[in-house]
Amino acid sequence: MAKLKGLKKIDKIINNFTKENFGIRANLDKEFLAYCGSKRIGYTLAVETEDINFFLEDAQARFPEVHADPFLWFLMHEVGHCMTDDTWTEAEKERINCKKSELSEVEDDQLRNDLYHTCPDEYFATRWAGQWMIKHQKKIAKFWNKIQPAIMEFYKKNRLLEV
C-alpha cells in the first residue's frame, strides 16, 4: 500500500492541539471515534455527506453562533466524549449503549439520527464541544488556520483533490 503524503504533518498538528489542550492523543482511523478509557480519539479525512448533514443539523441548531467546519465539529465532539466520560457510571454507560444498539432497528434515517443525538453521551459531547469552541474562539481559529491548509495539501499531494 502506498504511503499517504502529508499525513504525518496532519497528525502532528492535531496531536499538538489535543495533547496541549486536553491531554488526549489522536490518530487516523476509519471514522471519528472516542476511546475514552485510553484518552484517545480517532479522526478521518473522509466523512460521508449524510453523516455530516445529520450531525451538523443537530450541532448547529444547538450552537448557531459556532461557525466551524464539519471536521472541527466532529473532532471536538470526540474530544467532548473523552472530557465528559466521567459523567456516567458504568451502569449508565451500559444503558446508553443498549439504547444506541436498539437504534439500528429504527428504519427512518432522520428519526434514528434524532434519537441518536438525544442519547446522553452524544448530547453532552456535542454540548461540551460547542461550549469549548465558543469560549476558546482564538484557539480554535489558530488550530483551524494550521490544520485546514495541511488537509488541503494532503488532498493535493495524494491526488484526492484536483485543482
Question: PLM features: residue spans?
Answer:
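Short Lys/Arg-rich cationic patches that frequently serve as NLS/NoLS or arginine-rich RNA/DNA-binding motifs
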Residues: 1-5
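Zn2+-dependent metallopeptidase catalytic core
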Residues: 6-21
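Active-site scaffold of zinc-dependent metalloenzymes
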Residues: 25-69, 79-86
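Long, well-structured alpha-helical subdomains associated
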Residues: 67-69, 108-163
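A conserved beta-strand element that flanks and buttresses the S-adenosyl-L-methionine
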Residues: 75
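Post-HEXXH active-site segment of zinc metalloproteases
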Residues: 85-122
